[in-house]
A protein has these predicted regions:
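Short cysteine-rich clusters marking metal-coordination/redox-active sites
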Residues: 81, 129-132
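N-terminal secretory signal peptides and thylakoid transit peptides that target proteins
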Residues: 1-17
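Residues immediately within or flanking Cys/His clusters that coordinate Zn2+
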Residues: 78, 126, 149
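Mid-length scaffold segments of soluble, non-membrane domains
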Residues: 72-103
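C-terminal segment of N-terminal export signals and the immediately downstream linker at the start
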Residues: 23-56, 64
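N-terminal post-signal-peptidase region of extra-cytosolic proteins
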Residues: 59-74
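Short, non-ligating residues that shape and space the ligands of small metal-coordination modules
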Residues: 90-91, 138-139, 161
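Cys/His-coordinated zinc-binding microdomains
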Residues: 85, 133, 153-156
Length: 164
């Protein structure tokens, strides 16, 4: 290998490694420097949510697929943020995506916010609660009509309130 090629490959490798490290530090969920109407200390969130929901809502984690009982929730009602109670999705927009996570084709108006998530190096659109900033999941462009969107949510980030 020639010195020029060796230097190029070394610098290219460093660039990929640097991008990976920066991407893994990218804010997801409540970690970004945004201000939301509902705020608590980390200790207060931990106490309120418990370890599993805290890891998702406040640290941007993901639950195991097919682990949420909300996958099988088919009653009429509202899915709200477990962190602050903000109504997020109507059961009318829930659909079976066969991905293992509760999925919706549209949020309620002004319920969510979105930002680019580069944690896995491939940019994705992260979805968070507009009221508390809690990480909810991601949105993809492979959903059903009328929006063509799949809001793929972590069940541990949600609570269901039946209609009535």
């Amino acid at each position: 290998m020639t010195p020029d090629r060796r230097h190029f490959l070394s610098f290219a490798s460093l660039g990929v490694l640097g991008a990976a490290l920066l991407g893994s530090c990218g804010g997801s969920g409540a970690e970004a420097a945004e201000h939301f109407p509902v705020r608590m200390s980390e200790a207060e969130w931990r106490k309120k949510l418990g370890p599993e929901a805290f890891a998702i809502l406040r640290k941007g984690g993901t639950e195991r697929p097919y682990s949420s009982p909300l996958n099988d929730e088919h009653r009429a009602g509202i899915f709200a943020c477990k962190g602050c109670g903000n109504p997020l999705y109507s059961s009318k927009t829930k659909f079976e995506s066969h991905t293992g996570w509760p999925s919706f084709w549209a949020p309620l108006p002004h319920a969510i916010g979105m930002r680019t998530d580069t944690v896995l190096l491939v940019p994705r659109t992260e979805v968070h609660c507009a009221r508390c900033g809690g990480h909810l999941g991601h949105v993809f462009n492979d959903g059903p009509p009328p929006t063509g969107k799949r809001y793929c949510m972590d069940g541990l980030a949600l609570v269901f309130h039946p209609k009535g």
